[in-house]
């Protein structure tokens, strides 16, 4: 997707006040999205709480090919033999969202730059747009834990100063 023009600061300044604050919302893709598409379709679009001008991240969470036959040390992990699209992501602006059908129309872009599959657990993450971000000592920002279809990502767009004395934790 061509770089969207974010509505800088549309989510205002943000200051964390406790441990474990969540700033993102998530929805899994319900249909594959291919290079050039200007829409993505998700399950439970209303959970994203999207509006025109929001930023989203489309990210492929799984789908790599792993060779477990190469494991000789007793661990459960194999060698990645083909990443396929696992880990690919892009940021896009939202032109419109239909919460009934789950269709999100991307904002004036030339379409997606990558392919994303529902079987590979691609998801859409709402990316808040802050003027400033302050995470004081004793506070933290975290994301939903990865549940096999969504979560596991923390993402923010900050226009100005970021103060990080606390933590941003994506380990859940």
Please state what every model-predicted region is.
Residues 2-90, 96-110, 140-150:
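Autoprocessing Asn-cyclization modules and mimics
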